[in-house]
Amino acid sequence: MQSAMFLAVQHDCVPMDKSAGNGPKVEEKREKMKRTLLKDWKTRLSYFLQNSSAPGKPKTGKKSKQQTFIKPSPEEAQLWAEAFDELLASKYGLAAFRAFLKSEFCEENIEFWLACEDFKKTKSPQKLSSKARKIYTDFIEKEAPKEINIDFQTKSLIAQNIQEATSGCFTTAQKRVYSLMENNSYPRFLESEFYQDLCKKPQITTEPHAT
């Protein structure tokens, strides 16, 4: 059981490449794409933070407080290293983590986790059923557009559960994805330029007095 989980963790964020083994060109293309994404991470992070500061508010042509880029303080960013839950509980931390996962081509994990959080809050049986099917088609079924890396047994159990959807349909899968992120993506995030930049305190420079 433990070795199976280790293998799952090792494969977190690694896309299922059907052309695996086709050589350097595939790897070179992936590395080039990754470098491009990493190069503009600040722009993407700014977008996430700006939008997370004004949820549900439409953009207008006028400048407003909601449209101002708000960067979390270094002290707030440092709190995210205390626990994975601290990161997820912060809207800025969550936005930064999503931007980081996007640069690593594995944002489907956090998107699935967030979809499950929303799903568990759903009260209407009709909405519960429709959301369950959407989560299944988006993340669970074979070759889903955002397919997550979970075992066949869990997938089969979910396929049965969504026939009569309850708030616990995706509990097992959500816990496994959470564990994958906590043990793999989260440590890499804390070591990344993404995070280190946010933790830096601005340097105060003083101009020399005129003589």
Swiss-Prot record:
GO terms assigned for molecular function: adenylate cyclase inhibitor activity; beta-tubulin binding; G-protein alpha-subunit binding; GTPase activator activity
Quaternary state and interactors: Interacts with GNAQ. Does not interact with GNAI1 and GNAI3. Interacts with EIF2B5. Interacts with PRKG1 (isoform alpha).
Organism in which the protein naturally occurs: Mus musculus (Mouse)
Compartments reported by the entry: Cell membrane; Cytoplasm; Nucleus, Nucleolus
Predominant subcellular localization, coarse grouping: membrane
Protein name: Regulator of G-protein signaling 2
Stated role: Regulates G protein-coupled receptor signaling cascades. Inhibits signal transduction by increasing the GTPase activity of G protein alpha subunits, thereby driving them into their inactive GDP-bound form. It is involved in the negative regulation of the angiotensin-activated signaling pathway. Plays a role in the regulation of blood pressure in response to signaling via G protein-coupled receptors and GNAQ. Plays a role in regulating the constriction and relaxation of vascular smooth muscle. Binds EIF2B5 and blocks its activity, thereby inhibiting the translation of mRNA into protein.
Summary of the knockout phenotype: Mutant mice display increased blood pressure and impaired relaxation of vascular smooth muscle.
Post-translational modification remark: Phosphorylated by protein kinase C. Phosphorylation by PRKG1 leads to activation of RGS2 activity.
InterPro entries for this protein: RGS, RGS2_RGS, RGS_sf, RGS_subdom1/3, RGS_subdomain_2
